[in-house]
Amino acid sequence: MIIGLTGSIGMGKSTLARMARRLGVAVHDADATVHALLGRRGAAVAAVLAAFPGVGTLTEGIDRKALGARVFGRPPALARLEAILHPLVRRREAAFLRCCGLGRRKVVILDVPLLFETGGEHRCDRVMVVSAPAFLQSQRVLRRPGMTAALLADIRARQTPEVVKRLNAEAVVPTGLGPRPALRALRANLTMARSGVRRWRRGKRTYRPHA
């Protein structure tokens, strides 16, 4: 079973992915893949430099801050970047799934921040959304270096609304009460997935921002 793990910025998705790994689940991290693609001698570096000259070098990779300044708030530029990165991420993801299939893993997780925004839910048997109250989300995100309220507002505007994610997912894992309740919820969902139990609430899967 392929579980798509997603959640808006600051909801605790990365923490939940780490928990899943500790429980023995194979996790493909889309964000980490992007970092590798843009890093030193990364597979996307040449194409990104061709599209956005001056944001890095072929040997040292891409300066993510410089790249962000060129694309955030500029939909055509962001679309150009995504057209470079998304196919490469999909290839890495497909290779991961092939390896998991060879290893006969019953459950794997695709950790994808923009799962719904890119149509990634169609590649998953189930979708698990990580959620927390908006005030807690803001507290977490604004503690990050370089983050501002304006930047957070821009990120939120580009992400699928929280209520829509919850409605379109089969499982919602709350992180607002701390790690222990989140871990319990994760364990319960993984147990159902591994046993083939079909008690997961079917998500509506009606949101189509990518259509």
From Swiss-Prot:
It is found in: Cytoplasm. It is an enzyme of class 2 (transferase). GO terms for biological process: coenzyme A biosynthetic process. One of its GO terms (cellular component) is cytoplasm. It holds the Pfam family CoaE. Its EC number is 2.7.1.24. It comes from the Bacteria. ATP binds at residues 10-15. Keywords: ATP-binding, Coenzyme A biosynthesis, Cytoplasm, Kinase, Nucleotide-binding, Transferase. GO terms for molecular function: ATP binding; dephospho-CoA kinase activity. CDD domains: DPCK. The keyword Transmembrane does not apply. It catalyses: 3'-dephospho-CoA + ATP = ADP + CoA + H(+). InterPro entries: Depp_CoAkinase, P-loop_NTPase. Residues 2-204 form the DPCK domain. Pathway: Cofactor biosynthesis; coenzyme A biosynthesis; CoA from (R)-pantothenate: step 5/5. HAMAP family: Dephospho_CoA_kinase. Catalyzes the phosphorylation of the 3'-hydroxyl group of dephosphocoenzyme A to form coenzyme A. Belongs to the CoaE family. This is Dephospho-CoA kinase. It comes from Rhodospirillum rubrum (strain ATCC 11170 / ATH 1.1.1 / DSM 467 / LMG 4362 / NCIMB 8255 / S1).
